[in-house]
Each structure stands twice: as structure tokens, then as C-alpha cells.
UniProtKB/Swiss-Prot annotation:
N6-(pyridoxal phosphate)lysine modification, residue list: K265
Protein name: Glutamate-1-semialdehyde 2,1-aminomutase
Family named by the database record: Belongs to the class-III pyridoxal-phosphate-dependent aminotransferase family. HemL subfamily.
Pfam families with a match to the protein in the record: Aminotran_3
Alphabetical list of PANTHER family matching this protein: GLUTAMATE-1-SEMIALDEHYDE 2,1-AMINOMUTASE (PTHR43713), GLUTAMATE-1-SEMIALDEHYDE 2,1-AMINOMUTASE 1, CHLOROPLASTIC-RELATED (PTHR43713:SF3)
Length: 426
């Protein structure tokens, strides 16, 4: 069933570290060999062995309209024919930035970059420059990209490999990263009591790299109040949740407002792009207006801007999309929960918009430590058995799943039928 993928992976390992260009893809969390994908269309992936899968990963979130959406595909081809990159300003950047600014009451200006990592890295530099302080607060299990100062208990791939941080990261950098427990207000208060040099808190308001674990309203309120009290800035990392959890991401669901928001994934519709945004008072500190430097050769490249612009305009023109996506996500996870209960399997589920998560555990996880208590062996078995039946879930208990518009109720019901067969023997 996977012979050609195994062959492809073996060859890849000879010239690419671990055979992949992002660690989680190597299936280390669940074991085995990853399928090598040949193409995607709509809700489906097709691998080199000819296997077809309903895709509940959607490239880890960007493809809210599924693979090869005709509207996005059309503008990408049209734009690419005019040039892939100019290293000069284009109107497309202004149009996409304007679309984003119009949607948020706490954003005046946007700066585009080429990845989510660049977005969070730049947002932290901006916060440090604006406040004149050095320390940053992050939370166990929240992943903010692979820049040096953020690779501390980062969840996702690092969690899979059991690394609290990565070799190659100088202690001189991580000493300014203060680690707190997610959803633990007392722990956060102590952090601020211990340091008078905190520039910012960076948080995933809906954590997606320890499975799906939302921050409580009380916790986000505490983040806001502590930042205001101590002259720090609050950064929402919405690289994953932006335009996914709702039209305005997690920011549109929670009551707390951030000073800086980072974006990625959906705003590129599958193209490499990231962004960070804030008020004009904060953003005016960026070069060339201000003294805080940030740059990128491919930042704001026209193809990514065109794809993102079409994606956002489609979302804004169809406000019912999020309700429909959430209903599908609930149909899936509630169905899985019902099956798990039938077979007396400890199982927890949650959704936010088109994002979903499930855990093989007794109680609903509230933080990284809770997720670590889940049954990872059972998850791995479930993952592989569902893969054999044609359903492609995230290959780690620490990852979030995604619904796209092309996934149908028929696809979900077929998935639940397969899950019933798997869980009765799990």
C-alpha cells in the first residue's frame, strides 16, 4: 500500500536530513513512513502509491478552500505570468494590507514577511524596541516558529522530539525568554514579579501546537492587565488561528485585545507568507519610518499577495463559511467522541471555527503538561489505521486538525464509519 512512499522516503533521507524539510512530517510521533504526496484536489490528497485520502491537515492550516481552489489558482497563474518577484513595491501589498486593516479595530498598519517564524521574530523585536526592555514571556507548548529565543518548550515538533530547547541556541539568547505555564494566572503573575525587564507576552490565544487548547478568557484578561500594569506589549500569535477560528481569527472570538498580531497560513492560501500588524503608533517605529530594522527580499512578493488577497476576499464575501465549517468540525469530533464513549475509550475533543483537536485522555487538557499525559500509543495506532482507510489526520497528538470548504458531510460520515471500525479494536 505504501511501497513507493517507502522508496521515496529512503531516497530522500540520503540527501535531506531526516528525509523531510520540517520535522513533524517524518512521522516520528506516530512511527512508520510518511506517505509521499503526488497531488491535492479539493478535500483530497493523492500519494505516489495511488492512495486517496480525505485531508484533515490541509497543509497545516492554510488551505481553507481546499487544494487547487479554482479562484485562487487562477489569480496565482495570472500574477505569476507577470513576474514572480520584483524586490520593489506593488499595489497588491497595499490592497492585502488594506483588507486586513479594515477587519480589525486595533490594527492600522501591516508589514508582510515570508513566514510565520519571521512574523513572530519581527513582532518581538518590535516590542523590545518600543518598550526598551529585553525579556519576553512565552508559554509551555506554544510554538512561535524556530527563531532562537522562541525555541523553549515550544510544543509541536520539539515536543515530539522531547527537546525543551534546541542545540545551537545560545543560552545568552534564551536567558531573556521567561517560560510560564499556559492558563496559569498565578505562575504568570510570579513571572512579572520576578522581572522588571519584560517587553512582551507572546501567546497563541488558541494554542494549536499542543493539540487544540484554547486560553481561558480569565487568563487572556490577566495577560492584558499585567502587560498594561508593567509597560509591556501583548502579542497574539495568530499564524494558525488567524482567519481560521473566525473571519478575524481568535481576536474575533475572545474579549481581550492584543497590541500586536502575527499572521500566516490562510493569508497566503498555501503560498509562503506571514505578517505582523499593530497600531500606527507601534508600527511607526519600524524602518524606514523608525529605527527598528526589519527586511526581506521576498517579503510581499506578488504571487503570495495575489493568493492571499483572493482568499480573504472570498472569505469576506461569504460570511456563512465559518458557521458551515464549524458545524462540520463539530460533526466530526462529536461523532468521534460518541464512538469513543461507546467503546469506553478516554477521549476529549474541542473546536474553534474550522480548527479541531482530539485527545486520548481522561480529562480535557488545559496546558502542555496535561497533553503530555495523553495516550500517545493509542493515538499512533488510530492515526495509522485511519490512514490505511483513507483519512489523513495530523501525524502528532501535539498538532491541530483543519476542515476546508471542500470537505463534505459525506466525507465526515465515511470517516466516522471507519473510525468506528478502528476504535472497536483500539
Amino acid at each position: 500500500m505504501f511501497g513507493k512512499s517507502i522508496e521515496a522516503y529512503t531516497k530522500a533521507c540520503e540527501v535531506i536530513p531526516g528525509g523531510v524539510d520540517s520535522p513533524v512530517r517524518a512521522f516520528k510521533s506516530v512511527g512508520g513512513t510518511p506517505p509521499f504526496i503526488k497531488k491535492g484536489k479539493g478535500a483530497y490528497l493523492y500519494d505516489v502509491d495511488g492512495n486517496k485520502y480525505v485531508d484533515f491537515v490541509q497543509s497545516w492550516g492554510p488551505l481553507i478552500f481546499g487544494h487547487c481552489d479554482k479562484d485562487i489558482e487562477k489569480v496565482v497563474i495570472k500574477t505569476a505570468k507577470k513576474g514572480l518577484s520584483f524586490g520593489a513595491p506593488t499595489k497588491l501589498e497595499t490592497k492585502l494590507a488594506s483588507e486586513i486593516v479594515e477587519m480589525y479595530d486595533n490594527i492600522d498598519k501591516v508589514r508582510f514577511v515570508s513566514s510565520g517564524t519571521e512574523a513572530t521574530m519581527s513582532a518581538i523585536r518590535l516590542a523590545r524596541g518600543v518598550t526598551g526592555k529585553n525579556d519576553i514571556v512565552k508559554f509551555e507548548g506554544c510554538y512561535h516558529g524556530h527563531s532562537d529565543s522562541l525555541l523553549v518548550q515550544a510544543g509541536s515538533g520539539l515536543a515530539t522530539f522531547g527537546s525543551p530547547s534546541s542545540p545551537g541556541v545560545p543560552s545568552d539568547l534564551t536567558k531573556h525568554t521567561l517560560l510560564c505555564e499556559y492558563n496559569n494566572i498565578k505562575n504568570l503573575e510570579k513571572c512579572f514579579a520576578d522581572s522588571s525587564d519584560i517587553a512582551c507576552i507572546i501567546i497563541e490565544p488558541i494554542a494549536g501546537n499542543m493539540g487544540l487548547v484554547p486560553a481561558s478568557e480569565e487568563f487572556l484578561k490577566a495577560c492584558r492587565e499585567l502587560c498594561d500594569k508593567h509597560g509591556a506589549l501583548l502579542i497574539f500569535d495568530e499564524v494558525m488561528s488567524g482567519f481560521r477560528a473566525s473571519l478575524t481569527g481568535a481576536s474575533g472570538i475572545v474579549k481581550t485585545k492584543a497590541d500586536i498580531i502575527t499572521f500566516g497560513k490562510v493569508i497566503g492560501a498555501g503560498m509562503p507568507v506571514g505578517a505582523f500588524a499593530a497600531s500606527k503608533e507601534i508600527m511607526s517605529n519600524l524602518s524606514p519610518e523608525g529605527k527598528i530594522y526589519q527586511a526581506g527580499t521576498l517579503s510581499g512578493n506578488p504571487v503570495a499577495m495575489a493568493a492571499g488577497l483572493k482568499s480573504l476576499r472570498k472569505l469576506k464575501a461569504n460570511p456563512d463559511i465559518y458557521d458551515e465549517l464549524n458545524k462540520k468540525a463539530l460533526r466530526l469530533v462529536n461523532g468521534l467522541k460518541k464512538i469513543a464513549n461507546k467503546y469506553e475509550i478516554p477521549f476529549q475533543v474541542d473546536t474553534r471555527g474550522s480548527m479541531f483537536g482530539f485527545f486520548f485522555c481522561e480529562k480535557e487538557p488545559k496546558n502542555f503538561k496535561d497533553v503530555g499525559l495523553c495516550d500517545f500509543k493509542r493515538f499512533a495506532t488510530f492515526h495509522h489505521e485511519m490512514l490505511k482507510k483513507g483519512f489523513y489526520f495530523a501525524c502528532s497528538q501535539y498538532e491541530t486538525g483543519f476542515i476546508c470548504t471542500k470537505i463534505t458531510n459525506k466525507d465526515i460520515d465515511a470517516c466516522l464509519k471507519a473510525a468506528n471500525e478502528v476504535m472497536k479494536n483500539l
